[in-house]
């Protein structure tokens, strides 16, 4: 990119980022492989939450092996439920799409073969592009599925000082007995600092049955997990009942896990800028323990031996969530979702158009939106039925790889009332219903004209730049 064009682009970008009503923003970039790298091209997407002047971390979600998982890998950054987690803690959310020569994903599951450098290079590029220079310094939460789980655990051994916590779903350092022609997996005892990093390993119960094609993969999980627990690592293991290699409902546990660990690990917000943040060590002696055989949970002071058959759980709340998930594959959500916001009402003769914004329920996502006029339910906005992945027709759903279902854009948060005689903007209300069936408080409408006056903002398309796209949205 020519220097003059870059300067102009940065100035335009700063105008947006310094606007008092900064919207959520998404950036994409591509990293070309180096001459010594085994991987192909690596694409990355990062989502920056609204009204977050300084980011405190990155939640990075690494897809698994194969064309199907890679195809929608970038959409990990578009998942509205994970975005709610990121927004809550002032984090960016990031996904990837890594190409493997001849579909050999071992070219990238070993970070030292090029995928670690690609990840770090992408962060530098996206930090500059987004105007959030701190991205190059903030710590990470890593989530990975299958091959992405292998990558995640190996990254925990290579960069323990940067990792707040990790959630590998169906993967350890490597499948048991596997050999590699290039870089080799890290050894369980190769980096003592990793034994301070909180990790929650998770896999489907059916995977660890004799004869299952993923048996060796899960045997590798047990190798690293049991070594770590014997050395008092703050690690946990959750076996997902009635599940195999698919993610199913494991996000219920993963999101709650990160939500509890992030504040326990992050340093004081007043920490000096432009330095790698020193993460806090999780407490010992005040945590909870989960026994793998009985699924009983209790305070840690009651357990003195057989640590490798138990899980470290930060507190009673997380212990309860772990127990429920391991027993039922589901964690109940007893709190209603956050109400929608910015309900704009635009009237045209006898037709009225409603538009709104909403955050997903962090624990259980969005089932639907309910629309009311003068207190009467007049409509509901939900999603598209899918027999396998969305049998209830929820507004928001996910696939085998825990990516937004089919990469579809969510249905717009829009409703048109064609029978609106004598209705005023304040007569309309909208609520959010989560997947537990709990309904939020209702948000009252405001006229589009009034809303527009209150919320002037700048929208700029930078998609003509050489190496990334940028767009803004609610």
What are these regions (language model features)?
Residues 52-56, 62-103, 209-211:
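Short substrate-entry loop that stabilizes the transition state in hydrolases
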Residues 108-132:
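Alpha/beta-hydrolase active-site loop
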Residues 164-165, 170-251:
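The feature captures the conserved acid-bearing segment of alpha/beta-hydrolase catalytic domains
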Residues 241-341:
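Alpha/beta-hydrolase-fold serine-hydrolase catalytic core, especially in secreted/extracellular enzymes
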Residues 328-365, 440-473:
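Pro/Thr/Ser/Gly-rich low-complexity, intrinsically disordered linker/stalk tracts
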Residues 368-423:
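Recognizes extended acidic, P/S/T-rich segments that occur
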Residues 417-436:
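Beta-strand-rich modules
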């Amino acid at each position: 990119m020519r220097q003059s064009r870059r300067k102009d682009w940065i100035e335009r970008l700063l105008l947006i980022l310094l606007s008092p009503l900064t919207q959520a923003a998404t950036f994409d970039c591509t990293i070309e492989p180096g001459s010594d790298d085994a991987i192909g091209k690596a694409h990355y997407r990062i989502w920056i939450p609204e009204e977050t002047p300084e980011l405190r971390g990155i939640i990075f979600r690494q897809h698994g092996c194969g064309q199907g998982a890679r195809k929608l890998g970038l959409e990990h950054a578009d998942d509205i439920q994970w975005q709610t987690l990121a927004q809550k803690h002032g984090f960016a959310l990031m996904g990837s799409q890594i190409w493997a020569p001849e579909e050999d994903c071992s070219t990238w599951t070993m970070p030292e073969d090029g995928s670690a450098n690609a990840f770090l290079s992408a962060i530098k590029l996206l930090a500059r592009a987004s105007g959030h220079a701190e991205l190059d310094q903030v710590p990470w939460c890593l989530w990975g599925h299958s091959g992405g789980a292998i990558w995640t655990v190996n990254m925990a051994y290579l960069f323990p000082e940067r990792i707040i916590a990790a959630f590998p779903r169906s993967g350890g350092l490597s499948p048991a007995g596997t050999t590699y022609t290039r870089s080799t997996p890290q050894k369980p005892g190769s980096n003592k600092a990793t034994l301070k990093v909180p990790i929650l390993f998770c896999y489907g119960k059916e995977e660890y049955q004799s004869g299952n094609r993923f048996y060796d993969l899960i045997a590798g999980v047990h190798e690293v997990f049991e070594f770590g627990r014997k050395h008092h690592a703050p690690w946990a293991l959750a076996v997902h009942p009635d599940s195999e290699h698919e993610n199913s409902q494991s996000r219920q546990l993963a999101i709650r896990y990160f939500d509890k660990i992030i504040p326990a690990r992050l340093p004081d917000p007043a920490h000096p800028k432009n330095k790698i943040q020193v993460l806090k060590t999780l407490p010992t002696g005040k945590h909870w323990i989960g026994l793998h055989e009985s699924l009983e949970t209790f305070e840690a002071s009651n357990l003195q031996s057989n640590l490798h058959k138990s899980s470290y759980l930060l507190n009673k709340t997380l212990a309860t969530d772990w127990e429920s998930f391991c027993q039922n594959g589901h964690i109940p959500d007893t709190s209603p979702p956050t109400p929608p916001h910015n309900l704009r009402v635009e009237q045209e003769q006898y037709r009225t158009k409603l538009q709104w914004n909403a955050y997903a329920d962090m624990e259980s996502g969005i089932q639907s939106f309910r629309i009311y006029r003068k207190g009467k339910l007049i409509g509901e906005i939900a999603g598209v039925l899918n027999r396998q992945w969305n049998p209830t027709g929820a507004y928001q759903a996910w696939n085998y790889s825990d990516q937004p279902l089919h990469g579809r854009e969510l249905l717009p948060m829009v409703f048109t009332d064609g029978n609106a005689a004598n209705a005023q903007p304040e007569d309309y209300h909208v609520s959010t219903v989560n997947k537990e069936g709990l309904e939020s408080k209702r948000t009252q409408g405001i006229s589009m004209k009034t809303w527009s006056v209150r919320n002037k903002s700048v929208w700029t398309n930078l998609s003509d730049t050489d190496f990334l796209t940028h767009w803004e949205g609610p």
